[in-house]
């Protein structure tokens, strides 16, 4: 086994953050280092990378040395080779930093055990160095893993209420506001592509949010799934807590809907692959109803995927938006199918982080948000729903995802 026996507390609590039943990043992929001579005097354990991951890093380090020799001989690098060289350089720098911090920890550990006169000072340095070392280890694992195929893409978020009636619609609006707040916090450009409110205007029936920042998909893809809220509705007279849900779909944004000609979109599909229906926009009546045939419905015949768009008064703009969403849905569908085939080929037993079950609970009475995939809990609902502390939840899930992908990589080897 590549995992040594270790002991960790079942739950660690720090500034309102809980790490529950899921183990922290690297633990299941590493051996925990302890020193039996210390008699418990060493304040914090640290974890070493799996030998298989270290071997992979050493392989990249050796490849970089070969490329350095080529450069010193005046061999020209094309654009792709320059990018590969830059990637290897960044990875090797992190690997060197990892080894340096690991050696420092081992030296301090030995000092704590063997030199009582320096023990107090060494223990303090040791405790300060462990989290720095773990952060470096996490960065190294992320660099060793293959990137997500759409990691550099902008993103589209589709939000729809689930069970819970009006309360689910209100919660869907809360989630939309959270993602807008998060985009503002990250200083990302965004646009609401479509938003359909319910009759009372208190919630939304569906919405599509475009995050135009390159790489935002890699960050937000962990938001895909069913979100659950537990709270007392304003209309509840007996003080009972109600449970409602909303579904979030996160897609990579493929193409540029600001293109001057819609022909560019249609040329990406074979003749007869797309059925385009033009119709009059529907709405609440009065000024909300368009008097021209501007609404567009696209049907991708091979897959049966249908996209309708009527938010713009211009048929051209609605068609462009519809093609953008259709291409994003098709790209995500193909990626998921490919992942499923690879998973079956490896006979992997690792659960997918893209499951469409309840991924997260927002509990208002307890001021608690819990991500059920990685066991992360944060006691600050207003901070998360404002978008300002959503990064902490996403980061916990990102680390868990890295752990699972690294585990798959090791098992496949």
UniProtKB/Swiss-Prot annotation:
Entry keywords, A to Z: Methylation, Mitochondrion, Protein biosynthesis, Transit peptide
SMART domains noted in UniProt: PCRF
Disordered: annotated segments: 335-363
Chief location bin: mitochondrion
GO biological-process terms attached to the record: mitochondrial translation; mitochondrial translational termination; translational termination
Cited function: Mitochondrial peptide chain release factor that directs the termination of translation in response to the peptide chain termination codons UAA and UAG.
UniProt name for this protein: Peptide chain release factor 1, mitochondrial
Other observations noted: Present with 414 molecules/cell in log phase SD medium.
Subcellular location, record wording: Mitochondrion
Any single Pfam family the record assigns to this protein: RF-1
Taxonomic lineage: Eukaryota, Fungi, Dikarya, Ascomycota, Saccharomycotina
InterPro entries: PCRF, Pep_chain_release_fac_I, Pep_chain_release_fac_I_sf, Prokaryotic/Mito_RF
GO cellular component, one term: mitochondrion
Family membership noted in the UniProt record: Belongs to the prokaryotic/mitochondrial release factor family.
Modified residues (N5-methylglutamine): 287
GO molecular function annotations of the record: translation release factor activity
SUPFAM superfamilies from the UniProt entry: Release factor
Post-translational modification: Methylation of glutamine in the GGQ triplet is conserved from bacteria to mammals. N5-methylated on Gln-287 by MTQ1.
